[in-house]
Amino acid sequence: MKIIIAPAKIMKIDRDSFPVQSKPEFLDKTRILEEFLKSRSEDQLIELWHASKKVTEQSIEQLKNMNLDKRLTPAILAFSGIQYQYMAPDLFTQPALDYIQKNLRILSGFYGMLRPFDGVCPYRLELNTKMKGFIDYSLYHFWNDQIAESLFKEDDTVINLASKQYMRLVKPYLNENRKMITIDFQELKNDQWKTVGVHAKMARGEMVRFIAENQMKNPAELRDFHDFEFQYSPEASSLDHYVFRTHFDFKRH
């Protein structure tokens, strides 16, 4: 089985912890996006990114220094959002690192899809960006079915730990031979079970580590996940939707 996760907006450079092992599968398409971004004026980039002045200035500097072939960081270390902090890949055993290189995939608006040890550089390009002036009106259209085709080349089951924005790279291309199981983390709020974004990101990171450390091959094994006191809920789940619920007090964590 393959596991998909979303990238993070915050990126960092780390060339010391682990070596780069591979190149991104869709690097030729990434070069097209790089060329487009570098052809935009500062005002056009501001409109494209919809970011604060500080973030825009940082992103423009990143773009000026961008080199897709040199001084790269392994993708699993390049993203530093909540999910990646709780995943803590720098603490993985070697078997767990080998497992994620084979089975974990990071979806990306800029790179399409990444293996953990593909070499990347910092970028700013959300998947839902309106691509004014580009050859395609949206990145969903630009990437089309390529991500799904690659994902299901070796496996018929994908574990979805990505956000709704990124799972749209895969979901439209499912069929009777392609199965995707979405993982949902819920907690009780005002007598209703709800997904709290920050806590879900924490749990997704912990679950990736749980899967990797235990070298899981069968989706049913995921039901044994109990971090943050989450319990698999059979009554709320279905064949393609695993729901985990908790009464854990995140405020005290």
Swiss-Prot record:
What family is this protein classified in?
Belongs to the UPF0246 family.
Q: Which Pfam families match?
A: H2O2_YaaD
| HAMAP family in UniProt | UPF0246 (MF_00652)
A GO cellular component annotation in the UniProt record:
cytosol
What's this protein's name?
A: UPF0246 protein lhv_1883
Q: Record's superkingdom?
A: Bacteria
What is the organism field in this record?
A: Lactobacillus helveticus (strain DPC 4571)
Positions of disulphide bridges: none
Biological processes annotated in GO:
response to hydroperoxide
